[in-house]
Amino acid sequence: PGTVTCNENEIIVEFPSYVGTKTLHASVVDPLGVEMLNCTYILDPEKLTLRVPYKACTRAVHGGYQMSIRVMNNSAALRHTDVEYQFFCPVEQTLEFSKSAACTKDFMSLSFPHIPTGLGDSTMVNESQMGWMVQAGHGPGAQTLSLEEAKGQGFGVLIDDNKMTLSVLLNATGVTHYVEGTSHLHTMFLKLSLVSPGQKMPFPSRAICLSGPVTCNATHMTLTIPEFPGKLESVSIENRNITVSQLHDQGIDVEAINGLRLHFSKTVLKTKFSEKCLHDQLYISSLKLTFNLELDTVSTVINPECPCDSPASIVSGELCTQDGFMDFEVYTHQTKPALNLDTLRVGSSSCQPVFKAQSQGLVRFRIPLNGCGTRHKFEDEKVIYENEVHALWENLPPSKISRDSEFRMTVQCYYTRDDMLLNANIKSLPPPVASVKPGPLALSLQTYPDESYQQPYRVNEYPIVKYLRQPIYMEVRVLNRNDPNIKLALDDCWATSSMDPASLPKWSIVMDGCEYSLDNYQTNFHPVGSSVTHPEHYQRFDVKTFAFVSEAQARSSLVYFHCSALICNQHYPDSPLCSVTCPGSSRHRRATGNTEEERVTASLPGPILLLPNGSSFRGVGDSKEHGMAGDVTSKTMAAVAAVAGVVATLGFISYLCKKRTMMLSH
């Protein structure tokens, strides 16, 4: 009678224009030709359409619905006609595209079950008269193409006995592209219609694809989703579905900035061996993201992997130079992302490059083998010299600096046993005249992973992560002194929330060489054994981490430690601090001192990051926290465990009372 369209909930019959609008009469009948009185249909003579719902108007058969209509036309041209027509529409859900598109670098693909060519009465339809039409996009900008036209605009169709697969290039007609940084998201609305004389069967579908690298640090993998009209409904990892409201409890945090950023804790990630990585690679298998996109549910499945770590060692050349230097070059585009050449440094020193060309993205170093923090070791027949280059990534936001924001590269060179031997004539100079003027006192304050005090934390490992009430092992030592007759006398140690030792507020941990008696978690002193040359030049103790409070509010979780000390003559102690016996009245000892000593203050090379015991960072990374927890300043973490307010108040009062000056003497 015209064109039949099978939609999701109804059948639409469009009658040809030669049927008069005033003479058209149509009704729905059962297979015996009896009108179905309980069927509610809509006949529009003006538009020459008949809309019939499946419910109560069709008969369910295998694979779909069957409907019969009777058309009566009383026009003079056709005289009186009464014709019955029968239609078949497949079940909608068996013909839908797959809900998740398969995504690759260049295209997305969808599949749905193969559609039989016998639509309606197979005896009346010639298979050669059937064809496919593709509608790409929706709204005013939608384009309807024949299958051949679609193939020329980025579409491909593969039909086998089981299913039809449609592949679409990401730059094809109807594909919408969204970008945020290096992350890309593509969406597509597609309606594939099977058209035959008098019948049209549409199969609408939406698809979404997400691509681009993830970023990883010491604690999390971060996936960026560009901003687009869809709304995230759930995340599924290996068929374990997690709703948005449950994400935080499952180790996934959501950050809504220019789209979405999903931060997956390392407890969610898996590890696998990878030939392209030095160490095991972190990844998520079958990560399914489900969105609500314009009242439709769409999903995409990806398998994100953390990028490999930077190479641990790069040999700069076979041999060190004959004049005792190591030469190497660093290019800004040597890594992805590129390096910020202004942040390059060698080891912990301030050695500068000998050549720098910003236009070429090149920096050249020439570092001495006996300076700039260069180390050496012996392996077989070689003496290997090595140093470490540090740099930040280019265009790194200031709030995102963390341990994983830094590029590290070890450079090496070596001498072999067969290298040329140099003859040197060394003349001994007369010893210098002894100076009786005391030199400046230099102190070092360091922290160690444990009470063995074997290897201190390196400068580049700060901030160091510690949890509340976990001990911090510290050591104060005298530098550049070999006199066995002197000893180090500890004065005060305290903590501040900024780098300035004189900043307020401050919290005392050692006072007058003894533990601070008003502290709930008092400092413990450790004996210095014979493992060092001059044990009297050292002071070792541990501090229990605590939450610093000021004016009843928790301070920043980044804490800076400082200590002051002086040198004593072991045989002629001339200061009360030189003969401290703890516990005792330290205030009285200081008040009775007749001499003033010059005290010297030393600070830790960097801050300590204090985390609450329940922090999600715990258990991630090295078991001794010999490293950083990542993204330190991207999210300020407030210390949670509160010390009694009276501790901060009394500590502040103590600071005001401690106005004094001491002079250094030996």
Swiss-Prot record:
SMART domains: ZP. Residues 417-439 are annotated as: Disordered. Residues 319-585 form the ZP domain. Proteolytically cleaved before the transmembrane segment to yield the secreted ectodomain incorporated in the zona pellucida. Residues 657-666 are cytoplasmic. It is a single-pass type I membrane protein. It comes from the Eukaryota. Residues 1-636 are extracellular. Residues 589-666 form a propeptide. The keyword Disulfide bond applies. The record marks G120, D121, H588, R589 as: Cleavage. InterPro entries: Zona_Pellucida_Domain_gp, ZP-C, ZP-C_dom, ZP-N, ZP_chr, ZP_dom, ZP_dom_CS. The ZP domain is involved in the polymerization of the ZP proteins to form the zona pellucida. Component of the zona pellucida, an extracellular matrix surrounding oocytes which mediates sperm binding, induction of the acrosome reaction and prevents post-fertilization polyspermy. The zona pellucida is composed of 3 to 4 glycoproteins, ZP1, ZP2, ZP3, and ZP4. ZP2 may act as a secondary sperm receptor. This is Zona pellucida sperm-binding protein 2.
